[in-house]
Amino acid sequence: RNLLSVAYKNVVGARRASWRIISSIEQKEESRGNEDHVSVIRDYRSRIEKELSDNCDGILKLLDTKLVPAASSGDSKVFYLKMKGDYHRYLAEFKTGAQRKEAAESTLTAYKAAQDIANAELAPTHPIRLGLALNFSVFYYEILNSPDRACNLAKQAFVEAIAELDTLGEDSYKDSTLIMQLLRDNLTLWTSDMQDEAADEITEEAAKQQKAVNNNKIAY
């Protein structure tokens, strides 16, 4: 189970990283007006997206037809449903329009199904339950653009795990505490971003009000 997950994660992870780099370069070249460069970069990006789609579709088919139906224990069900959500999320990262909407909806469905089982059958400190909370919160933040829900989910998972930290066995202590640290890091980052955005909005609103005052003065 873990070997399969790591194998696909390595293959898809490398292409996700390449896609991010290429997309960044494409934006820079577009801003500079280098259309010849942009055309070549787009072709390369399309090839990466094709490989990503094929890889994600391959593991999703395996999950739907074999792995999820055959899962019997609670942790196996959560593991494979989380995995299903992950690969739909990877598709949502680069798909557009109706395809992106479909991938996002499939991600949400898989994560929610996994969450229901995890909450009922796995301890708050279980690394698979924590990993699900981590990835689910990232989905809310990055794909659905919902920082409030992302922060609430991550915070709840972290607080619930902290409350039962003394029940952790040695075998899962390292994995669980590592994921908890990632949850806390994301919370710190996202909260900071939200505060920056709020400050920008306040500054913008103040500028508008000042402009209105100035306009009134001019009118008088």
From Swiss-Prot:
It comes from the Eukaryota. One of its GO terms (biological process) is protein localization. Pfam families: 14-3-3. InterPro entries: 14-3-3, 14-3-3_CS, 14-3-3_dom_sf, 14-3-3_domain. One of its GO terms (cellular component) is cytoplasm. PANTHER family: 14-3-3 PROTEIN. Belongs to the 14-3-3 family. This is 14-3-3-like protein. The lineage of its organism: Eukaryota, Viridiplantae, Streptophyta, Embryophyta, Tracheophyta.
